[in-house]
């Protein structure tokens, strides 16, 4: 009988989308990611690069997570970006994509931390001094992300999601008052 730890490692290598927990790496990432960006793997094979300097997704990829060998080559070796183990399926650009009140100008953003959840990750930051919690989780079908924004103030304000090259999108609220943004990609239902 194979001991549990090697069996889990073997299954993860053979079937990278079978992850049952959230995984976070903070390494040099490809595809134009800024230094300090987070690579996050969600259960079901949905992975993304989150830029804490701009408070938003940089890109999403599906399938396997990361090949970390180039980013952690050992002493005296050249460090290169980690390799994505799947295709990039969604990109977002532009500063501070979450906006309060008016779509312009970009607010002052300060990243304050993150918390791992059973099947999600929650990032915390302030926008013009207003504390915001943003929870990202994979859709059950694995073909998109759900982003839940919970601002501590400004409940009466209109909130926007701004991405370069797209028109501003007003965010709606769920029954609990959280702002909801569904992110899907080409071929997703």
Predicted regions and their residues:
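Beta-strand-rich N-terminal accessory domains
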Residues: 20-146, 159-161, 167, 172, ...
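Positively charged n-region of N-terminal signal peptides that target proteins for export
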Residues: 1-5
């Amino acid at each position: 009988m194979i001991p549990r730890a090697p069996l889990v490692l073997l299954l993860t290598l053979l079937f990278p989308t079978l992850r049952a927990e959230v995984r976070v790496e903070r390494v040099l990432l490809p595809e134009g990611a800024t230094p300090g960006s987070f690579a996050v793997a969600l259960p079901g094979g949905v992975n993304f690069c989150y830029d804490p300097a701009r408070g938003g997704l940089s890109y999403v990829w599906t399938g396997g997570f990361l090949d970390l060998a180039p980013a952690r080559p050992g002493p005296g070796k050249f460090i290169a970006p980690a390799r994505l183990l799947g295709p990039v399926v969604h990109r977002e650009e532009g500063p501070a994509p979450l906006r309060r009140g008016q779509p312009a100008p970009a607010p002052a953003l300060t990243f304050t931390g993150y918390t791992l959840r059973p099947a999600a990750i929650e990032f915390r930051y302030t926008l013009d001094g207003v504390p915001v919690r943003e929870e990202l989780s994979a859709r059950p079908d694995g073909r998109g992300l759900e982003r839940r924004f919970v601002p501590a103030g400004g409940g009466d304000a209109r909130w926007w999601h701004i991405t370069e090259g797209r028109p501003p999108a007003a965010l709606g609220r769920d029954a609990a008052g959280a702002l909801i943004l569904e992110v899907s990609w080409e071929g997703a239902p």
